[in-house]
Amino acid sequence: DRITPHMLRLGFISGDLQDFVSASPDDHIKLFLPTADASPDAKPCLRDFTPRRVDTEGGSLAIDFALHDAGPATQWAASARLGDTLEIGGPRGSTVVPDDFDWYVLIGDETALPAIGRRVEELRAGVPVATFVISAPGEKQTFETTAAWSPHWIARTGEADDASLLRAALADYVLPPGDGFIWIAAESSVARSLRSYLIDERGHPRQWSKAAGYWKRGEADAHEKIGD
């Protein structure tokens, strides 16, 4: 299904998925993507993705692909047809954020939308959750949730590794009272900058945050945990 002009959702079915465990919305799985090398010793191209929806009883898995470049994942997803197969591994481990905070703030770009969407949908009824997502125009999504969701969509006007628009949107946002959790995922330098701003300048407790670089300019298949 084409969720937005640049976001494609593909469904996978396998009996092996009945044993698939994904305890956290930002889990990572490895996709073993084919390459142009047809030799017997050719190795697949590995890429990290988020399990968007999992149905272990039905043996199905949904993965969202951000069609943002001509990389191997985009090429495979854009040309995938019913009956095509793909090897998937993981997730190897989960960092579970408790669903007992007073509020949540989720920040990211297109690459973070699968994890953001899943978390918004899985949060308990009534809990406030604000999302700040920067993307190309026309990439807004809607999520089915019983949480008190407040979406903030920021239209990108510059480079994808520019943190200024997200920071400006956050500067106008008053963090709610009580104990809250902030989650950030974007280009590595953006995620690091926003985490520093929210902790060092806004005073949010360091231990109640999680930040990651889901990609890094100039590097293929980059993923970086950001913290002390």
Predicted regions and their residues:
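Extended, composition-driven regions rather than compact fold-specific motifs
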Residues: 1-228
